[in-house]
């Protein structure tokens, strides 16, 4: 039986359009995998970090799971190094700096956080 939200989807990072997110120095890019129309509850996608450092206060709960390389995050006076097979959970409101050299996937809740915070 098909879900009312549509079919199951297989998503390959190589098929997505990555958008600049940070750098220079370095480079950072993200690619949202599903639109808010398909999934307003969960935002999912991939990111590539190549030495850029991006400061941000997250407006959502976030999970980051590393596929290749080493992702780094500075938050709460801690420095986290996340390698393939590991993941981070980051609660809403965390002030942080993303960094490192990695390909990683992410999940955010709510997926439509920009709309909820008046940023769209």
Feature map (PLM): residue ranges:
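A short, N-terminal "cap"/entry segment at the start of jelly-roll beta-barrel domains
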Residues: 1-46
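Short, conserved beta-strand element in jelly-roll/cupin
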Residues: 48-49, 57-75
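Short strand-coil-strand connectors
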Residues: 40, 50, 74-78, 101
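Conserved short histidine dyad/triad with adjacent acidic residue
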Residues: 37-58, 91, 108
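Short acidic-glycine-tyrosine-enriched beta hairpin
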Residues: 76-93
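Ligand-binding loop in jelly-roll beta-barrel domains
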Residues: 92-117
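Structural motif
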Residues: 63, 70-72, 79, 95, ...
């Amino acid at each position: 039986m098909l879900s009312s939200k549509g079919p199951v989807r297989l998503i390959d990072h190589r098929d997505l359009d990555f958008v600049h997110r940070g750098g220079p120095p370095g480079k950072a890019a993200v690619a949202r995998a599903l639109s808010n129309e398909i999934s307003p509850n969960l935002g999912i996608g991939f990111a590539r970090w190549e030495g850029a450092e991006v400061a941000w206060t997250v407006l959502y709960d976030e999970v980051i799971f590393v596929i290749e390389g080493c992702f780094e995050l500075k938050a709460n006076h801690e420095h986290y190094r996340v390698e393939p097979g590991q993941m981070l959970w980051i609660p809403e409101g965390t002030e942080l700096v993303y960094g490192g050299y990695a390909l990683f996937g992410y999940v955010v809740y709510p997926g439509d956080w920009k709309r909820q915070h008046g940023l769209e």
